[in-house]
């Protein structure tokens, strides 16, 4: 089962993609995704209901969050009412330990995203402040990475013994599925099921970026 674990819709302040347009694009371009997770910035969208779109396009659509910490950005899967009351999702300087502890205590799963990125990536903070012992999984493939960032993420994840996953970090329709995560299970249907599979470690990152077009011409 292949899921894009990191996407943004117009619910995020910098997102320009409607969720239905993601679904249409996936089907039009025959992107081999079974679903995607909406990780809106600094919030959890508890109001939106995408079940009709799931049925129409035969895609799993789950909701999570991307929060900002003193060690960079972190994706939180399995957000529930107890977790929402554990810390302020809108705070842009959350202590990462607070997020990791609260996620664990409330049955959620927290993992740093784009860790190879400057300033907002985990590993740039490791250089200054040292590693965090409770981190065990990071996003090693990110569809918005510039050259060198994913390579750094993969290298540092290996050094620290972290499990890696992938996500497109799409903010526009055409970027969805650039990177994703392949799971051994083919029966994820809920966010609780996703959390269970993430906790099991039975997954890996995958790049689905389109091949660059050959602009050379024959003589």
State the predicted function of each range:
Residues 66-90:
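A basic- and aromatic-enriched beta-loop-alpha substructure that forms the phosphate/nucleotide-
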Residues 70-74, 148, 175-177, 192-199:
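Short, charged, surface-exposed secondary-structure boundary motifs
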Residues 1-71, 93, 147, 172-174:
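An N-terminally biased module of ancient metal coordination in phosphate/nucleic-acid-related enzymes
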Residues 1, 34, 59, 108, ...:
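A structural micro-motif
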Residues 7-13, 44-47, 82-178, 182, ...:
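Domain-core and long-helix interface of multi-subunit machines
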Residues 187-210:
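Charge-dense polyanion-binding interfaces
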Residues 2-5, 75-76, 112:
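Active-site-proximal beta-strand elements of phosphoester/diester hydrolases
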Residues 57, 71-74, 105-108:
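Beta-strand-turn-beta hairpins that frame and shape the catalytic cleft
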């Amino acid at each position: 089962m292949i899921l894009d674990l990191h996407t943004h819709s117009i619910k995020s302040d910098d997102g320009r993609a409607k969720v239905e347009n993601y679904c249409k694009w996936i089907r039009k371009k025959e992107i081999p995704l079974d679903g995607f997770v909406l990780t809106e910035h600094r919030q959890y969208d508890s109001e939106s209901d995408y079940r009709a779109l799931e049925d129409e396009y035969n895609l799993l659509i789950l909701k999570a969050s991307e929060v900002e910490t003193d060690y960079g950005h972190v994706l939180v899967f399995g957000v529930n009412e107890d977790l929402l009351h554990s810390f302020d999702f809108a705070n842009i300087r959350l202590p990462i330990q607070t997020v990791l502890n609260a996620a664990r205590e409330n049955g959620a799963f927290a993992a740093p995203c784009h860790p190879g990125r400057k300033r907002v990536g985990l590993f740039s903070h490791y250089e200054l402040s040292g590693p965090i012992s409770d981190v065990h999984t990071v996003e090693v493939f990110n569809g918005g990475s510039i050259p060198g960032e994913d390579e750094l993420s993969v290298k540092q994840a290996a050094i620290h013994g972290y499990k890696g996953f992938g996500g497109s970090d799409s903010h526009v329709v055409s970027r969805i599925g650039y990177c994703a995560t392949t799971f051994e299970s083919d029966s994820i249907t809920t966010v609780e099921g996703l959390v269970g599979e993430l906790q099991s470690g039975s997954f890996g990152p995958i790049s689905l970026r389109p091949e660059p077009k050959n602009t050379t011409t024959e003589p």
